[in-house]
């Protein structure tokens, strides 16, 4: 029980540390700035797509009202009115103006993907046609699916089994959870589809559930603050809604990025988190596996390494292989794996450590045991090196500073 509690606390602490390392607060601020300029283009594109289908006429206004009533605190009514006016003006733009709005919406999606790729340590973002098709699908099919789902839910809510005198017990209670379920679905889709890497659906679902619950809590607390502390009206007057809306967007992006860190953290092996190895040792492990594969005439894949007992986090695997590729020690094979591209018989451990960005670990950083054939010899060499260092630098600091005399 104590071990589980320790692992649980360590897991959440590691998530917080990664959030700080990835500049989560700064990225949330950047996304808030981007959202400020992209919200009107996104709404314009959504209304344009919905108005193109006669069955969805007027659905856009209903969707907008549903979003502001359920996903934005009580200050959203004024902002909604502003956005409605801006969107009405945007509909009168020429095709060139509409194109600029679409580009703005595209840039917002690009910024979101870049931020997620930093969290997932993805070094190759989507490019070319794959990137264009994904963003186009979000901007075109997204509003249509949203409109269809909203129309279906409205029809279901109007059935006598839901709202009539013969309504099923608990049906209205279930409908009350519709905003929460919508949030879970939206967050899950965001975490599963946006990163340019494979994200397990169950991890995306857990992250979506976490973010949706945190989102509802934040909305309730934010609304409570607005009602109990109205002093901001004395400062900003009629414009008080605008800074509050920006703060809410910022909090929303903080929640999104925290959920993304959780989804990434769930995919990392727990045993590995409990027993971290110095990066220099990971480098030697990967080289040993590459050498063993080369002797069999095969390439090394990340999945095969995990099945072999090395539950190495994917970001550490990528960092090590990037270094080996830069130093022309390993290269990609045609099948997606990795092979050695240099004869290790003519390359010493000293040469490797000289060009490695990761320093040689101290004895205190080494695990007691490691199932690697080279590990006993390395540990003995480090012990001799430490003893020699003590012998060379064991005199008092005052003697060193005084110099020979």
From Swiss-Prot:
Keywords: Cell inner membrane, Cell membrane, Membrane, Transmembrane, Transmembrane helix. It is a multi-pass membrane protein. It comes from the Bacteria. Pfam families: Virul_fac_BrkB (PF03631). GO terms for cellular component: plasma membrane. Signal peptide: none annotated. The chain crosses the membrane at residues 36-56, 93-113, 132-152, 174-194, 204-224, 238-258. Its main location: membrane. It is found in: Cell inner membrane. Belongs to the UPF0761 family. NCBIfam families: PRK01637.1, yihY_not_rbn. This is UPF0761 membrane protein Pmen_2988. The lineage of its organism: Bacteria, Pseudomonadati, Pseudomonadota, Gammaproteobacteria, Pseudomonadales.
């Amino acid at each position: 029980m104590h071990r589980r509690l320790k692992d649980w606390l360590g897991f959440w602490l590691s998530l917080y540390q990664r959030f700080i390392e990835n500049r989560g607060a700064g990225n949330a601020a950047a996304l808030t700035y981007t959202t400020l300029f992209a919200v009107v283009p996104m709404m314009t594109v959504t209304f344009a797509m919905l108005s193109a289908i006669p069955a969805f006429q007027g659905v856009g206004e209903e969707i907008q009202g549903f979003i502001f009533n359920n996903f934005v605190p009580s200050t959203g009514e004024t902002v909604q009115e502003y956005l409605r006016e801006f969107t009405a003006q945007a509909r009168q733009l020429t095709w060139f103006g509409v194109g600029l709005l679409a580009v703005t919406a595209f840039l917002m999606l690009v910024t979101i993907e870049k931020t997620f790729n930093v969290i997932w340590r993805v070094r190759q973002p989507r490019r070319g046609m794959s990137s264009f098709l994904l963003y186009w699908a979000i901007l075109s099919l997204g509003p249509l699916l949203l409109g269809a789902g909203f129309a279906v839910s409205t029809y279901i809510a109007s059935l006598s089994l839901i709202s009539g005198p013969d309504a099923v017990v608990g049906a209205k209670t279930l409908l009350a959870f519709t905003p929460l379920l919508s949030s879970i679905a939206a967050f899950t889709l965001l975490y599963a589809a946006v990163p340019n890497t494979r994200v397990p659906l169950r991890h995306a679902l857990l992250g979506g559930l976490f973010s949706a619950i945190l989102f509802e809590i934040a909305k309730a607390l934010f609304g409570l603050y607005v009602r109990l502390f109205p002093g901001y009206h004395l400062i900003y007057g009629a414009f008080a809604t605008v800074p509050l809306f920006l703060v809410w967007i910022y909090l929303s992006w903080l929640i999104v990025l925290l959920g993304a860190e959780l989804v990434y953290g769930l995919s990392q092996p727990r045993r590995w988190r409990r027993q971290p190895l110095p990066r220099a040792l990971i480098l030697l492990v990967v080289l040993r596996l590459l050498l063993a594969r080369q002797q069999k005439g095969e390439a090394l894949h990340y999945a095969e390494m995990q099945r072999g007992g090395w539950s190495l986090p994917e970001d550490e695997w990528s960092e090590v292989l990037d270094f080996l590729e830069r130093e022309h020690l390993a290269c990609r094979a045609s099948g997606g794996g990795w092979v050695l591209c240099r004869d290790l018989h003519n390359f010493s451990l000293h040469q490797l450590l000289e060009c490695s960005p990761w320093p040689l670990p101290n004895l205190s950083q080494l695990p007691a045991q490691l199932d690697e054939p080279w590990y006993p010899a390395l540990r003995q060499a480090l012990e001799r090196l430490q003893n020699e260092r003590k012998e060379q630098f064991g005199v008092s600091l005052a003697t060193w500073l005084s110099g020979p005399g």
